[in-house]
Amino acid sequence: MRVRVLILSLLSVLIPAALAAQSSERPRVRDVGVVVGVMPTGEHNAITDVAGVRVGHTTVSDGASIQTGVTAILPHPGNAYMSRVPAAIHVGNGYGKLLGVTQVRELGELETPILLTCTLCVWKAADAMVEWMLEQRGMEQVRSLNALVGETNDGGLNDIRSRPIEPHHVVAALESATDGPVEEGVVGAGAGTVAFGWKGGIGTSSRVLPQSLGGYTVGVLVQSNFGGILQIAGAPVGVELGQYAFAQQVGRDEDYDPQADVQEWGSIMMVVATDAPLSDRNLERLARRAVMGLSRTGSYASNGSGDYVIAFSTANGVRRSTTGGPHTYDDLSNGNMSGLFEATIEATEESIYNSLFKAVSVTSNGRTVDALPLEETLEILRRYGAIR
């Protein structure tokens, strides 16, 4: 038994490392000349371009039937409970299990980092994060904590019924979180996801507004696991590759393979961060725009898709104190929101493309899901003028 545990532990290290090495060889969408929108990106073109935001991953894979993980997004380097950031949640389609949603909507703030994982591990991940938070200095008297945990269902590539996420996986994601470049593709909560019938995963992007619009940064991170009719910068990639939703029903060619009809169930978690001083009300408005970016990629928010957006602001002037009494906060006016809306749409769209471009093919749980074929995709993008 001890030998088996040691082998599984070794595989859990070697397999994610091998997948990460393959992913590093694949380009991001901007690397091949696809420029989404008009706003410039931040230094890393990642959610971590918003100062203070950190991301950590734990990938859990045994090479046989387990293919899942945890992704942690920390809003700032301090204690998320003691120094709360304003936040909002928008639900595009509510077929999902986002834990902690009602209190965020009621109070408009985060009390914990944000975790993403697989559907049946939401509660295990939340429990582990609560234990981790309660052990932090200054938390000795805390008796209520609103853990915010999102999910998508990776039950095709992952034996989800085994609920493989353990406390040490969650702690590792939280404690390994860093700023700088963010690993994308088959990693963390994106290890077992599928998007548009190809391997999905984690993707991220950012936008920086010009000084005339405030100079603020918006960053987005997604966990893509949904269906639809893939478009990239307007090019009908899914249709051209013959793999898209409703292909069997409305296909133009009698030779279409029924297996190419992309299943409509699935979900996406979208996390939006900004350093603009926004109230939770305007953060909710910002979150709605992420769904517009999602729709640009070919999603139609199917019946079985859980499409959720969590948005928060890291600006010092909007931090919420745990002490009583009146407080004064900065609040960007409604009239200054439009540039942030555009930035959110663009960064969400590009994040989804990056999740597909960086993902590699995976075989697990008796199933193989191929990565988006890059050469064929690039040829389609050139033909439709999507590459600049």
Q: How would you label these PLM feature ranges?
A:
Residues 1-4:
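Positively charged n-region of N-terminal signal peptides that target proteins for export
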Residues 7-17:
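Bacterial N-terminal signal peptides
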Residues 22-388:
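Alpha/propeptide regions of enzymes that mature by internal proteolysis
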